[in-house]
Amino acid sequence: MMKGLIGYRFSPTGEEVINHYLKNKLLGKYWLVDEAISEINILSHKPSKDLPKLARIQSEDLEWYFFSPIEYTNPNKMKMKRTTGSGFWKPTGVDREIRDKRGNGVVIGIKKTLVYHEGKSPHGVRTPWVMHEYHITCLPHHKRKYVVCQVKYKGEAAEISYEPSPSLVSDSHTVIAITGEPEPELQVEQPGKENLLGMSVDDLIEPMNQQEEPQGPHLAPNDDEFIRGLRHVDRGTVEYLFANEENMDGLSMNDLRIPMIVQQEDLSEWEGFNADTFFSDNNNNYNLNVHHQLTPYGDGYLNAFSGYNEGNPPDHELVMQENRNDHMPRKPVTGTIDYSSDSGSDAGSISTTSYQGTSSPNISVGSSSRHLSSCSSTDSCKDLQTCTDPSIISREIRELTQEVKQEIPRAVDAPMNNESSLVKTEKKGLFIVEDAMERNRKKPRFIYLMKMIIGNIISVLLPVKRLIPVKKL
């Protein structure tokens, strides 16, 4: 084997031992396994002397692999034979299942652990020799004729002799006799010869700075073509940077695909840019201005490096601006209604402003007699909200005011009788209505409710006053 490779060793896993070596051995494919594992009868040899020399592959880890035929103690094949000429292999521990990791974890075999004892069974002396015995379970029982024995030595390495195996020596003589030529030997890598990677030691020893490269020590042969394809790049400066070993050691143009330096004269496209005139306002309520964002690079540069949309023009930035200088309400409504009496003392004004379905009434009144409907002792109160004509409301207020002024001097001179009491009650009712309406003049929605309440009170008090006798003063 490859003796010159440090760390190289023959150490297959349990799955590899079962699936490859033992399975191919039982199926008759000896050419796949004989170069790695030799066949012996493990019960015919003493571990302390013979086993290391019989292994096909010698190991410094003090472990060896063998194919061994299965021998049974009785014809029923229920118990395997474990005794040797000077001792016996004693099973210990529990059997471990070996599963095929690439076959959904199916059990393909088991591994038994045994320790070699010198002497007669069951009394014997334990030795540092341990054996892992691999049995296959994925084949029919009549084909299970061999096991793989992994023998390990747990003692000192000085106690083991490493003489060449007689079988290996005989195999080498057989090859010479058949072919007439000795078996080729594996050689360690020598300077000047190619290794597995297709490189020689001379190529690795040769200094990098002795190779002839016209662009510099760190420029690849295809870098010159790449630089010519770039736009807005200072070719001389880039070559100088890549040629400097101290600044960029070991880098090439293939490692860096982004231009490092942009010429100052390429920024001339920005000289005419004015931030004040970049956006323009229109007289529309909602204005949308679309501007193409200027770029110091051309379309070819963007297509070459970004690869945007298979060569389509680069993205444009959309800028939206809304003009709010002439922002006004959509439906402005403003009106004023003035109510004035003949004497000039009674006046009322209503101002209403509406915007988009929202109204805010503002009512201002000049005197105490306004927003009233005519009421009398025999007539019921009329709803002011049903009157849509302002002239009718104003006329009723004036008539009511004049009637109240005419009744005041009559009430002073009239005698105190039942009729005068009714007049006073009527006057009081009118003043109460007037006073209530004045307090609630800013709440038109409650006018009808107040009129109904006051009318009910008057209608109740009038019959009561007629029944109660009034004493003369």
UniProtKB/Swiss-Prot annotation:
It comes from the Eukaryota. One of its GO terms (molecular function) is DNA binding. SUPFAM superfamilies: NAC domain. Pfam families: NAM. Its main location: membrane. Induction: Stabilized by cytokinins. Residues 108-160 bind DNA. Residues 4-154 form the NAC domain. Residues 326-380 are annotated as: Disordered. The keyword DNA damage does not apply. The NAC domain includes a DNA binding domain and a dimerization domain. Transcription activator activated by proteolytic cleavage through regulated intramembrane proteolysis (RIP) mediated by calpain or its functional homolog. Regulates cytokinin signaling during cell division. PANTHER family: NAC DOMAIN-CONTAINING PROTEIN 82-RELATED. This is NAC domain-containing protein 68. It comes from Arabidopsis thaliana.
